[in-house]
Amino acid sequence: MLAQAAPDGQRTTEHRLTQAERAEVIHALLKSMESDYILPDVAKQMAQAIREHQARHEYDSITDGEQFAKTLTQDLQAVSHDHHLGVDYSAEFVSDRPMDKPSPEDIRKFRLQGERRNFEYRRIEVLPGNVGLLQVDGFYPAEYVREIVAGAAGFLSHTDAVILDFRQNHGGMVDGPLLLESYFFKEMTHISDSYNRAENSTQQFWTMPVVPGPSLADKDLYILTSHDTFSAPEAFAYDMQALGRAKVVGEVTGGGAHGTKPYRLSAHFIASIPFNRGTSPVTHTDYEGVGVKPDVQVPASEALLTAHILALHGILARTTGDPGRKAELEKLIEDLEAKQKSGGVEE
């Protein structure tokens, strides 16, 4: 999120790209990609494709910066099918400071943006039958959201099951999902591994041993997805599914498993280049290009009602010695299944 924000700088007048400027951008792009892109063979294929386009003079007539960035992105993705990879144009001067180390002002603006959106924690409630629902539309750094997540955990602590709605979640920071995941385990658990090609290193990610607020480790967990669910929430769903900790309900996700960071290409161009790859310690692979396959595949619009019914069945199966509660659950399931059969949805 923060790494992709437009850099601060001095605004310049618009100008037409020259042949030299286009060549500078391409040279820097291919150099960074060939050294750091997470899949070396694919990096070579992309570099070859770009050089062939360049040799055929297909970029020569492009003098608009935004169009040049768009064309390069399309040509890269035509080979890689990696939607984390792309080139952006900035009308403002791009500082030559390290782009993965944002300035204090960048950080201030980023945090303020998050505060105005409640750091994307958008909805929390208890559905009929005592099923908790938490909608998260993006992941900010854990240090920003600790109080929000602890408050959400407290709100959900007396529910009998939890549904996480990621249908409109398009990504975010790595430690944001890890904080939320940590509430659903009793002990430290190995969640994922991340291989960094640029450093030739692998980092393990484990749930946190202690989290503020109550644990949700005893709750059945359901995760809602859509075709638009992408990147960080996909990793959350994929890893929890692989560990057998959650059932995924909804649509196959977007398929973006590669972590990215910004690279300065020139005074007005920036590339987002995936440099690492997260894999599950259970499957030893990821969901890049294929998405997370739901346990129960339904249209996104039907996912909440479907998960609600599944959660109630799970609660009913555990209910003993309380005829009144059992009858309540059976009636609620009957009503919701009738709604489902008639084409109704839950919003």
Language-model region placement:
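C-terminal, low-ordered peptide segments at domain boundaries
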Residues: P7-G9, D75-H158, G289-A307, A311
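Mature N-terminal segment immediately following signal peptide/propeptide cleavage
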Residues: L17-Q48
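Terminal peptide-recognition signature
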Residues: L29, L76, L134, L164, ...
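Extended, small/polar residue-biased N-terminal targeting/export presequences
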Residues: I38-L127, G321-E347
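A mature extracytoplasmic/lumenal domain signature
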Residues: Y89-A91, D137-Y140, Q168-H170, R197, ...
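Short acidic catalytic loops
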Residues: L134-Q135, H158-G171, L224
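Gly/Ser/Thr-rich loop/hinge elements
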Residues: G172-Y222, D228, H258-P262, N276-R277, ...
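Low-complexity, Gly/Ser/Thr/Pro-rich intrinsically disordered linker/tail segments
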Residues: T285-E347
